[in-house]
A protein has these predicted regions:
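N-terminal pre-domain segments of enzymes
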Residues: 34-129, 492-498
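N-terminal cap/lid segment of alpha/beta-hydrolase-fold proteins
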Residues: 107-108, 112-116, 127-191, 201
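Cap/lid segment of the alpha/beta-hydrolase catalytic domain
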Residues: 190-298, 335-345
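Mobile cap/lid helix-loop segments that gate and shape the active-site cleft of serine hydrolases
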Residues: 219, 261, 265, 269, ...
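Alpha/beta-hydrolase fold nucleophile elbow
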Residues: 298-310
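Glycine-rich nucleophile elbow surrounding the catalytic serine of serine-hydrolase chemistry
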Residues: 308-320
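C-terminal catalytic histidine-bearing segment of alpha/beta-hydrolase fold enzymes
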Residues: 361, 407-408, 422-498
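Conserved strand-to-loop "acid loop" that flanks and positions the catalytic carboxylate
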Residues: 396-416, 467-469
């Protein structure tokens, strides 16, 4: 599962968390305090644990509750998988009630009052703020080919680098890696799905005379799927695709927070509590990729979607919520920090995201909600001013497809498919308010039960489908394409002979 973006709680939280499990808390003491910060103009180099402790010190936190242990036989702080114990905070933050108690009854009130309130809470407490001084990105094609094919369909493929201006702090370089592939003989600009992550060679297709690799994942044998790769399904449907490398934007660890785009903007210094985390940085990078696509004559930039699986599913949801130019999203197996309700006690918990293994995804302030002891006392998921249903609602009225697989194939209960379904249901009123369609089921998230596997709720702009595959999105890709085509008003062209 690690190869697919799923990080086991014990592995993800590292040695520090393993030690803390024995006592039930993460303790900050004089012996493990963060080192002094370097002079301004010097690039800070810390370990993940040192950076994590520094943020705890900034927030005045002395002890954190440990993350849950997702192992089936765990005896130390095991994750809960009992539905009867899953809802300690049954009431979610109000979606359509303003902070001063007014009901939101019009689209204008949503856009001018309630939505900005929700955005502010997410930026301050959960995912962080994009700085105003982020430098510009200049894109250049480094490799291109018109002699490639995807499932025997000729394509135009190009690899690009988006160089971020680092003139203000030359010691940090950020070069965003992206591959763009579109049908070579398309008669008009095509819709395109941008996908976080890479596919072998970064999504760059083979020449027709090159053999297909027989083993996509080393050490796992020849994996078989019921469906072709997502890239093949997209090209066959007349779409284009792009793959964008998250790690070329921002590293997926706490030690990288003084590097990458976050470190560049901060000139090598550690984050402040409201600064952005990796999820927001990856979303920013996707938006810069869209900047390029708006200049590409083969792409219909009004019909560009965003996709991701696992942590990149979280990033895809954040991207659609905060970048209005994206038209649609496929949010796959996103779990805690994505479509899963923070307030659910099932599988992964807020405390896993506040530990040293995953805190870098979030704003520093998010760590407060795992605090056992601090200058402000203790806080938990029930103290968060927002929850996942509101993050999904920020995508409205644009088409938003929430996707999961099944535990038997590797999409573990750890992800809490039911809790994610409840969040999707609870987001429905915002879609309806804005003239879009919800899931077409009850909007009472407290009693909502997810439909059977392979039963899609795909009639509206808000969609849900749990496929019978694993920790991936390809098993839902054909359903996503058919659903998206209707909503963006695109018809797959008939095959043509060039």
């Amino acid at each position: 599962l690690g190869n697919l973006g799923f990080m086991h709680p014990l592995r993800s939280s590292g040695k520090r968390l393993l030690a803390s499990l024995a006592t039930g808390v993460f303790a900050l003491s004089a012996t493990n305090a963060a080192p002094a910060q370097p002079p301004s103009g010097t690039n800070q180099t810390w370990t993940t644990q040192q950076d994590h402790r520094n943020m705890m010190e900034q927030l005045g936190i002395t002890k954190l509750r440990p993350g849950r242990n997702g192992s089936a036989n765990a005896t130390n702080n095991p994750a809960n998988y009992d539905p009867a114990k899953a809802n300690p905070f049954p009431n979610l933050p109000e979606l359509l009630v303003t902070k001063d108690g007014r009901k939101v009854t019009t689209a204008e009130m949503w856009w001018k009052v309630r939505r900005p309130e929700i955005v502010e809470d997410f930026e301050r407490e959960v995912i962080g703020r994009v700085p105003k001084n982020v430098p510009k990105v200049t894109w250049a094609i480094t490799n291109e080919a018109r002699d490639r094919a995807v499932t025997n369909i000729p394509v135009y493929a190009r690899q690009l680098v988006g160089k971020v201006d680092n003139s203000a702090f030359p010691s940090i370089e950020v070069n965003i890696q992206m591959t763009v592939v579109t049908p070579l003989h398309a008669k008009q600009p095509v819709p395109l799905l941008m996908m976080f992550g890479g596919f072998g060679g970064g999504g760059f297709p083979r020449r027709p005379d090159e053999p297909e690799p027989t083993n996509r994942f080393r050490g796992f044998g020849n994996l078989t799927f019921a469906d072709p790769p997502s890239t093949e399904q997209l090209i066959a449907a007349g779409w284009g695709y792009a793959t964008i490398s998250p790690n070329s934007i921002q590293a997926d660890n706490g030690a990288g927070l003084t590097k990458g785009i976050i470190g560049l903007v901060n000139k090598g210094q550690p984050r402040k509590p409201e600064d952005w985390g990796s999820l927001r940085a990856w979303a920013w990078g996707a938006a810069r990729g869209l900047d390029y696509l708006e200049t590409d004559p083969t792409v219909n930039a009004k019909k560009v979607g965003i996709e991701g699986v696992s942590r990149y599913g979280k990033a895809a949801l954040v991207t659609l919520a905060f970048e209005p130019r994206f038209a649609v999203a496929l949010v796959a197996s996103s779990g805690e920090g994505g479509a899963k309700l923070h307030r659910r006690n099932f599988g992964e918990a807020v405390e896993n995201l506040t530990g040293s293994g995953e805190y870098h995804w979030m704003a520093g302030n998010f760590i407060k909600y795992g605090a056992a002891e601090s200058k402000f006392g203790s806080r938990n998921a029930g103290d968060l001013p927002v929850d996942a249903h509101q993050l999904i609602a920020l995508c409205a009225p644009r088409p938003t497809f929430i996707s999961y697989g099944i535990p038997e194939k590797g999409d573990a209960n750890w992800l809490d498919q039911q809790g994610s379904y409840m969040a999707t249901v609870a987001a429905g009123p915002a879609f309806r308010l804005l003239g879009a369609r919800n899931l077409g089921v009850t909007e009472d998230y407290r009693t909502a039960q997810k439909p059977p596997v392979n039963t899609g709720l795909l009639d509206g702009e808000l969609a849900w489908r749990q496929h019978d595959g694993g920790h991936e999105s390809r098993s839902n890709m054909k359903h996503f394409i058919a659903w998206a085509n209707k909503l963006i008003r695109y018809t797959t062209p008939a095959p043509t002979n060039p």
